[in-house]
Amino acid sequence: MSLAAGREATLLAFDYGEKRIGVAVGNSLTKSARPLVIVQNRSREYRFEAVGKLIAEWKPNALVVGLPMHPDGTPHEMTQLAKRFGNQLNGRFNLPVTWIDERYSSVEAKAEIRAGNGRADMLDAEAASIILQQYLDGLSDDHEFH
């Protein structure tokens, strides 16, 4: 779905982990992101059922997935798993997926929580929010979502 320049878009972002997947929601017009929920990564069926419910509820125009990398920019053990998850999201829900370098997002999320700006039980969702905020901060004002 293509949106005219300056139109509002809803986005969901994911911080993929083997045990938990942090989810955040954001808005392209306000360029703001917030932690939403943590999905337990119990099985493929459970994961995609939970994500499907979130997509049905929030009706996002696009998805963002954090891409784990080592500090020097080389692929991390989780890089391929996160890419696969994003590809599966695209295939199952027919929504565009953008991958964002998530180096230090968990470190930033922990710092936010220590500073009193988040909840410890929402660490993964806080990391997803940081990933999404990085994406939103990089958007031009006339970006179109396809």
Curated annotation (Swiss-Prot):
UniProt record similarity statement: Belongs to the YqgF nuclease family.
Keyword Phosphoprotein recorded: no
MF-aspect GO terms: nuclease activity
SUPFAM superfamilies per UniProt: Ribonuclease H-like (SSF53098)
Uppermost EC category: hydrolase
Compartmental location: Cytoplasm
Coiled-coil ranges (or none): none
UniProt protein name: Putative pre-16S rRNA nuclease
Function statement: Could be a nuclease involved in processing of the 5'-end of pre-16S rRNA.
SMART domains, sorted: YqgFc (SM00732)
Keywords associated with the record: Cytoplasm, Hydrolase, Nuclease, Ribosome biogenesis
GO cellular component: cytosol
EC numbers, comma separated: 3.1.-.-
Species of origin: Paraburkholderia xenovorans (strain LB400)
GO biological process: rRNA 5'-end processing
Superkingdom of origin organism: Bacteria
InterPro entries: RNaseH-like_sf, YqgF, YqgF/RNaseH-like_dom, YqgF/RNaseH-like_dom_sf
